[in-house]
C-alpha cells in the first residue's frame, strides 16, 4: 500500500508542477502587452526551473514520461481540425509545402551555424590535419 501511495504521489506531484508552470505562463501572458502564448511561457518557466536546478528533474519525470508516451493521441484533435478545412488546404497546398520546405532548410542552416559558433571546431581523434 505504501509503495502504491508513493507512486501516486510522484505522478500527482509531476502533473501539479507541470500544470502550475502552464497556468503561471497563461497568467503572465495575460499581463504582457504583446501576444505570446501562455503555454510557451509556461514551458520556458519549467525549463528555467529545471536548468537552474530549482526543481529536481525527478519531480516531473513521471508526468513527462506519460505525456511523451501518449503524445500521438494529443495530435488527433488537431488533425481532425485540419481536415475540416481540407478544401482550403488543398487550394493552397503548393505554397504550404514550399513554405514548409524552405523554413525547414532555414532551420537546418541556422542550427548548423549556431552550433559551429557555440561549439567551434574540435580536432577529431585519429584525424590527420595541420601540424602546428
Curated annotation (Swiss-Prot):
Tell me the membrane topology, using the record's own terms.
Multi-pass membrane protein
The superkingdom of the source organism is: Bacteria
- Family as reported in the entry's similarity comment: Belongs to the UPF0299 family.
Task: Record the organism.
Answer: Klebsiella pneumoniae subsp. pneumoniae (strain ATCC 700721 / MGH 78578)
What is the name listed in the Swiss-Prot or TrEMBL entry for this protein? UPF0299 membrane protein KPN78578_25390
Q: Which GO terms describe its cellular component?
A: plasma membrane
Give the matching Pfam families. LrgA
What residues form the membrane-spanning segments? 5-25, 38-60, 66-86, 93-113
Q: Where is the protein situated, by its record's location annotation?
A: Cell inner membrane
| Record keywords | Cell inner membrane, Cell membrane, Membrane, Transmembrane, Transmembrane helix
